[in-house]
Structures are given as structure tokens and as C-alpha cells.
Regions:
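C-terminal and inter-domain tail/linker signature
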Residues: 1-134
């Protein structure tokens, strides 16, 4: 990675505000994606579906992501995400989260890149097999 080419002077308060509603968006309101994600938004799920596919690869932009979230909630209506911790450092951020599927719990981490204005431009997401301890 070329450090100089990838330096962005990001509005950290706006970036943190985007992360503050990230899980609300996953849990209840896909419209939030249109406010906090950039037009060139991408998400990379590093855990594929059971059949080896990765529908997140087709997401490009906030509108596309909002549709993806609606589809996800239709397929997983009992999923509830909760924040463990988050941090923003310039153009980058991270969030540790837990998800509850009925009696099953797991944890994960999302790593974010932000635009200059604090919109989420890109996310790398990894889910684990056990929840984070809180």
C-alpha cells in the first residue's frame, strides 16, 4: 500500500457518528446505509456462505448495500447485533461486535475506511465462532 497515496484527512467526528449507527442499520433500518455509506461503498465478507458464495461481493454503493441489508434481514430475522467496542483513527476505524441468533452467539470485527467527509467507503468483515467477552 502506498501510504502517501492513501492518506485522507477524515472528519473523525462524522466517521464515529457513522459507526455509532452501523449496528442499528444492520438490526433495523437499511435506510441508514444511504446516509453513512459512500456512492462507491464496498463490503468484503471474509467468511463465505455455506455454498461458498459471497453475496457481499456484488454490493457497490450505498443503495446496493441497503438492498443487501433488507435481504439479509429477511433471511435472518432473529439476528441481533450489539457493539462491544469501536474506534476511529483518521481515515480508518474498527468495531468489535457480537451477534445473537436465538441461543447461538458469535463475535466479529469490522475494519473500515472512510471518505474525507466521514462516510464509510469500504469494510472488511470477519465473523468468529464465539462471542467477544464483555
Amino acid at each position: 500500500m502506498n501510504k502517501i497515496a492513501n492518506m485522507v484527512d477524515t472528519n473523525s467526528a462524522a466517521a464515529d457518528a457513522a459507526l455509532a449507527v452501523w449496528l442499528e442499520m444492520w438490526n433495523t433500518d437499511s435506510e441508514i446505509a444511504r446516509r453513512i455509506c459512500s456512492d462507491d461503498f464496498r463490503i468484503h465478507f471474509l467468511n463465505p456462505d455455506q455454498d461458498g458464495s459471497n453475496p457481499g461481493d456484488d454490493v457497490l454503493g450505498a443503495e446496493s448495500f441497503a438492498r443487501f441489508l433488507d435481504s439479509y434481514r429477511e433471511q435472518h430475522p432473529d439476528a441481533v447485533f450489539s457493539e462491544v467496542t469501536r474506534a476511529v483513527d483518521g481515515a480508518h476505524g474498527r468495531m468489535l461486535w457480537n451477534v445473537q441468533f436465538g441461543k447461538v452467539a458469535a463475535g466479529g470485527i469490522d475494519v473500515f475506511d472512510f471518505t474525507e467527509g466521514g462516510l464509510i467507503r469500504e469494510v472488511w468483515s470477519v465473523a468468529g465462532t464465539r462471542a467477544h467477552l464483555t
